[in-house]
């Protein structure tokens, strides 16, 4: 899969990558289980329409032991019964936080 944004060929893109990496480090150092972290990364990549990122995070999740069934159902997590309540809460927050441009209200207090 080919990246749509050349992070190394554009100085602004490099700054964006630096902030993304900083955010990823905060998440990686948190108490959020690794499996949930990967589900969140996959879902946000799907929402953003980034095939490169979706592919990368799906491979990372597989390597970490995630099942194919659960990976297949990330996009339909609301209807799927294979996710825990905690994972569903993380996916809801991801959904609302990633779709900030789509909704003037941003993340609801309830999801937060």
Sequence positions of predicted segments:
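Hydrophobic alpha-helical segments
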Residues: 1-112
């Amino acid at each position: 899969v080919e990246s749509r944004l050349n992070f190394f060929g554009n100085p602004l893109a490099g700054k964006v990558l630096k902030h993304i990496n900083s955010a990823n480090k905060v998440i990686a150092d948190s108490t959020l289980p690794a499996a949930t972290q990967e589900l969140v990364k996959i879902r946000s990549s799907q929402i953003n329409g980034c095939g490169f990122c979706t592919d990368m995070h799906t491979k990372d999740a597989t390597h970490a032991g995630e099942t194919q069934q659960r990976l297949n159902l990330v996009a339909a997590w609301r209807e799927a019964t294979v996710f825990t309540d905690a994972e569903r809460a993380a996916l809801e927050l991801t959904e609302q936080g990633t779709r900030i441009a789509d909704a003037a209200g941003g993340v609801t207090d309830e999801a937060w």
